Amino acid sequence: IGFTADLGDKVIPNIVGVDIGCGMLTTQIPTDVGTIDFKNLDEVIRNNVPAGRNVCDEIINFEELEELHCFHQLKNIEWIRRSLGTLGGGNHFIEVDTDSKGTNYLVIHTGSRNLGKQVAEIYQKIAIEDMQGTDKLETEIQKLVKKYKHSGRRKEIQNGIDELKRKWKPDKLGIPKELCYLTGEHRKQYLHDMKICQEFARINRRCIQSAIFYTMNWTLQRNTWFDTIHNYIDHDTNIVRKGAISAKYGEKVLIPMNMRDGCIIAVGKGNEDWNCSAPHGAGRIMSRSKAKENISLEEFKESMDGIYTTSVQKSTIDESPMAYKPPQEIIDNIKDTVEIVDIIKPIYNFKASE
């Protein structure tokens, strides 16, 4: 799964999507931890990492939020601030995996939460308005205001604006609203705000990492973690990656397959034919609704045998391994873009459930 392209001097917010900067933070768990008490870990996560629609009780400061060009259009700012350190739902997860040498890893998959969603929707609306010629209407309004002020007709300004809006007819789009794009200053503003959302998502994962390591009394050692992100535009190359990750030469990446079969740790080959990219995950073979119709809870439970999880429930059937493409299909199709180092297997999994 995944899409990559150089969109040139245009950008379509909908292609990047609503979960800007979503990704996986992979952290090596210290070897001196020994056998992990998964019951305790599960309680720690449930008590310290809000999931689903839940947010934190306390606000974690994120000063860059007010640097967003669209800041004043955001709704429920406090809710956004309280979203740092939260997992969310859907395919987001927290997992402990073990590699072929017995080393354990904590993997956290989450993104920019409601902030990314709002920013994406704000800029897609701007893209639609721009392509409908709303900027021309704004220019006419500015001319009218200047003219009326100059001629001492201030009291007539509002009526004049209302009349312009009444007569204005939007340009025909010629393309679906979902594919409307930004250019010029609005493109620059979106890229700026998208980068802030990416940072929000990165810090969100780090907050979860810190909460788990601190509460479990694990030592967080330097240079033992790496981030693999998707749903963004690479500022250096202008490549958009939707459901795709960077796989530049020598770059360490993580590609999750499903909650039973684990994740691929690989190193990028820098293949230009692939836009130096790789899929961010396995991709679904069943929609969420189809999975809930066709997969039984019993089948789901059997598929997760041997993995500690309290998240296998009716509400999470749509995330069962059978809803995703077979691991071998992924392994066979990524060899041109990454070198597989290891496949880490899950021994603990947590997903939000109702």
Task: Report residues per predicted region.
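N-terminal glycine-rich flavin-associated loop
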Residues: 26-29
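Domain-length cofactor-binding catalytic modules of enzymes
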Residues: 1-13, 20-24, 36-53, 70-82, ...
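Acidic, glycine-rich loop-and-strand cores that form catalytic or ligand-binding grooves
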Residues: 60-61
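Long, basic N-terminal domains or extensions that often function
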Residues: 31, 69
